[in-house]
Amino acid sequence: RPRIYFEEWDEPMISGIGWVSELIEIAGGVEAFPDLATRKSAPERIVTNEDVIAARPDIIIGSWCGKKFVPGRVQERPGFGQIPAVRDGFLREIKSTIILQPGPAALTDGLAAIEAIVAEWLETRAAAGAATAAQT
């Protein structure tokens, strides 16, 4: 199961709210910051570069509340090159309109988007494993 950091905002970096964390788990992922997900207000879910580096997410999903997620800005953060998601290129966007508003869209479209990202990650891992096995 991939560890997922869901970034709701970039400056300051804010991790995902509770229902997003639940959708990550339902989709087959592991929430990178489960303790923060239970906190309702955004200021209580602020994380630092060091927090994200220590969490070592396999996938980073950005949903920057109405502005476009820019993977390059995430990749340029100090120390982020050592994070598996950044090293392996697993930075994805989910539009905030389908994930950050509680209700039917989050439960259908938002969940489906997370499931697709998790499935892509699993397929990539399986292909890498098969390639490694073929070399031995």
Per-range role (PLM):
Residues 1-108, 112, 120-134:
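Binding-cleft/active-site segments that stabilize strongly anionic ligands or cofactors
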